[in-house]
Amino acid sequence: MSVILNSLAKNALLGFITYLIIVIPREYLRLFLYNLSLSIFLKEKSEKEEEIYLKKPHFYSYIDPLGLITFLFLDFGWSHTPVIDYRKVKGKLLFIFSLLGVISSILLFLIYGTISRLTNSNYVFQLFYLGAKWSLTMSIISLFPLPPLDGSRLILSFLPSKYYEWYLKFSFYCILFMIGLIVLWIFPMIMQPLIIFISNVTNFLIF
């Protein structure tokens, strides 16, 4: 019994650390690329992090408890993006900001996959193999058009500003909707073929 509990504890710790390394670097990388794209490609003044969000986030602000739990038990999940100041980030800027979340996850997938491929440490391999797999999962999940995922903000970026308030109100109900899909096992059934595809792509990169 103690062996089983130790194994569960180790897997839970590995999953939690993996979640941290796919979520926190993703958001900081997103902000870096966002500022870079504004200053280089759009020739616009770069926005500071505290100007993008209504409230300056801390590292734990990106952790979504439900997203963490689903990653641990169902092999897919999501992160929490603090509320954006839609008065400053809208239209073209919102599209870029949302798309860069997906791109950041793909970059982390490539980085973590390369690390796990080159390392000789079994623990480092497990950590970054799972990090690569979950980063690719995050990039795909983010494209779902469900608030507050990036896919919904990509659509929102094409809508007039008057719909932004509606979006914020709808986000809460959409979270309840996602919980319902998980409880009814609909979301896991939808994700199952995607998880198999993601595992195959990850294995192709690493092995």
What are these regions (language model features)?
Residues 1-207:
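Hydrophobic transmembrane alpha-helices and their immediate loop junctions
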